[in-house]
Swiss-Prot record:
The gene is pheS. It comes from Oenococcus oeni (strain ATCC BAA-331 / PSU-1). Mg(2+) binds at E259. It comes from the Bacteria. Binds 2 magnesium ions per tetramer. Transmembrane segments: none annotated. GO terms for biological process: phenylalanyl-tRNA aminoacylation. The lineage of its organism: Bacteria, Bacillati, Bacillota, Bacilli, Lactobacillales. One of its GO terms (molecular function) is ATP binding. This is Phenylalanine--tRNA ligase alpha subunit. The keyword Cell wall biogenesis/degradation does not apply. GO terms for cellular component: cytoplasm. Its EC number is 6.1.1.20. InterPro entries: aa-tRNA-synth_II (IPR006195), aa-tRNA-synth_II/BPL/LPL (IPR045864), Phe-tRNA-synth_IIc_asu (IPR004529), Phe-tRNA_ligase_II_N (IPR004188), Phe_tRNA_ligase_alpha1_bac (IPR022911), Phenylalanyl-tRNA_Synthase (IPR002319), tRNA-bd_arm (IPR010978).
């Protein structure tokens, strides 16, 4: 059999194989066995060197034509098989577009924001205003208007981040007291406000202290405001946040802007009349007291006619009690394993 006959026989054989092939893998095997380095067509073409020089152009042209025809047939068959495979796959993987799609992870309110919202809602229901102050405050409103003149020894109680000699990161939301009293028209009734926000002190971070923490200032100024009003206000707040059963303890303290001044502790654990005092674990949550007459005077309010109470509470500490968290630093570590425990319903 000469080369021409071999080429014609190969063309017929491969054409039949292409027609019968039923998968992309089979058609690829045909291509390799035909055109690969050791393929059938390659072997035949190696015999061209032994032909008479006059036959070489004729046989070479014939071989190239058959090669082109077979490559075209393989390509077309492969395309058909790929389309059939895709159609079969689509038919077997029907998508029900009425089913819900994949949900994306979304952010939720931080646990401290949740506590702050609960506290705000409580006081709004009691007729208070919510006033947001500035985190960068002046020395005048942060200290002087709070009865802390520049030479006052109590300034040493608070290590402060100063930006300039007269501008600082506020150390307390109490700075909002003077601004609120300056703006309020007392002819319309008493001033009742809370002011939530971040405060900054040069504290060493530990389990219960942080250089940056949240605080909510409360202030009521009006006629005949008493210490009993303050105690009742704080008891109502803790009962709503924690439920009844957490003991509250008032200790005498000192703050330059209140007189008398109190430290208020709340029990970690719930207690009843049978709980022994040594079994109660306390955590300090706020400072409070009656507004100092000097603070009222600096706001042009007559302390003989008006009185008031103020308190500053830490929502961080409230969250620790509410959820049994023993280290305040957990709130600021951005650990999703911790924070996801406090997702609200619907989030």
């Amino acid at each position: 059999m000469d080369i021409k006959e071999e080429l014609e026989e190969l063309k017929k054989k491969v054409s039949v194989e292409i027609d019968k092939s039923s998968s992309v893998d089979l058609i690829e095997n045909i291509r390799v066995h035909l055109l690969g380095k050791k393929g059938d067509l390659t072997k035949i073409l190696k015999g061209l060197k032994d032909l008479d020089p006059r036959e070489k152009p004729v046989v070479g042209q014939m071989a190239n034509k058959i090669r082109t025809q077979l490559e075209t047939m393989i390509s077309q068959k492969k395309h058909i098989l790929e389309e059939n495979k895709l159609d079969a796959q689509l038919a077997s993987e029907k998508i029900d577009v009425t089913l819900p799609g994949e949900t994306f992870q979304i952010g939720t309110k931080h646990v401290l924001q949740q506590i702050q919202d609960q506290i705000e809602d409580h006081f709004l229901s009691q007729g208070y205003q919510v006033m947001y102050g500035r985190e960068i405050e002046t020395d005048e409103y942060n200290f002087e208007r709070m009865n802390l003149p520049k030479d006052h020894p109590a300034r040493g109680m608070q290590d402060t981040f100063y930006l300039t000699p007269n501008v600082l990161l506020r150390t307390q939301t109490s700075a909002m007291q003077a601004r609120a009293m300056d703006k309020h028209d007392f002819s319309t009734g008493p001033l009742k406000m809370i002011s939530p926000g971040k405060v900054y002190r040069r504290d060493n971070d530990d389990a219960t202290h942080s250089h940056q923490f949240h605080q909510i200032e409360g202030l009521v100024v009006g006629k005949k405001i008493t210490l009993a009003d303050l105690k009742g206000t704080l008891q109502a707040l803790t009962d709503e946040l924690f439920g009844k059963g957490h003991a509250m303890r008032f200790r005498q303290s000192y703050f330059p802007f209140t007189e008398p001044s109190l430290e208020v502790d709340i029990s970690w654990n719930t207690v009843d009349k049978n709980t022994a005092s040594q079994d109660i674990e306390w955590i300090e949550v706020l400072g409070a007291g009656m507004v100092h007459p000097n603070v009222l005077k600096m706001a042009n309010i007559d302390p003989e006619e008006y009185s008031g109470f103020a308190f500053g509470l830490g929502p961080d500490r409230f969250a620790m009690i509410k959820y049994g968290i023993d280290d305040i630093r957990n709130f600021y570590l951005d650990d999703l394993r911790f924070l996801k425990q406090f997702c609200q319903v619907g989030e």
